[in-house]
Amino acid sequence: MTTTTTLDLTGLKCPLPALKTRKALGRIKPGERLEVRCTDPLAAIDIPHLVGETGDRIESVTREGDGLVFLIERRIVLEDRQGQ
């Protein structure tokens, strides 16, 4: 069973959703998932950009009410990627 951690960033504005998502991704293990809930419209750009930088994968993006829910799979550890 895959572990999913939920990060509720509702009400936070740029750049906080991306910064908090990066920090949370650093705390979970490869293979685990992070569910990010946010209402900042810029998160639609910032979160996918962040995930591209970290080498992780967005499994899904859904609209819920006035916000977005990202489901992100942790793929590699940031420190490992820096050495490549």
Where are these regions (language model features)?
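Conserved beta-strand core positions
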Residues: T5, L34, L68-F70
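Short, compositionally biased "basic patch" segments
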Residues: M1-T2, E73
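Amphipathic, hydrophobic secondary-structure cores in small proteins
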Residues: L9-V61
